[in-house]
Amino acid sequence: MLVGGRGDDAEYARIERLTAASDVPVTLAGRLESDELVRAYRSSDVFVLPSFYEGLPLVTIEALACGCKVVATDLPGVRPWMEAMLPGAPVTWVAPPRMTDVDTPEAADLPLFERALADAIAQALAAPPSTFEPSAVSWEACLGRILKVVDLLEGGSYG
């Protein structure tokens, strides 16, 4: 398992302790440069974003563009946008835990959320290869769809 990114120092220290105790081999890659990130995505089968708060998770789109299946938290606004803009994308959605505020989960819900994530990862790994066309998530393709929506909202007739 490859874990990318880096939170604050306390969070990272906790992650290091958890990975040291894990039965699963874990590599903590930290922050990756763009070319390293693309190589990491392309060598991976599944990208997991167990987030509690997101606007538009661009990392998910990057992972899809590199051919990954995705497991992500089903956050308000994200799933409808992804399904409308990227129909057929290989994304498995996991219900979030209850939240005590905008980005703090209810502690009692975390074991069930973690189990649901593990099940979704296993499901994604066991699924046949996706037929999703990664060019659907190129910058040009995404921008074209966004411009079309903006134009239609303004009463135009884009494209």
Question: Regions from the language model: what does each represent?
Answer:
Residues M1-A13, L28-R31:
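Glycosyltransferase donor-sugar binding loop
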Residues R31, R39-S44:
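Short alpha-helical donor nucleotide-sugar binding micro-motif in glycosyltransferases
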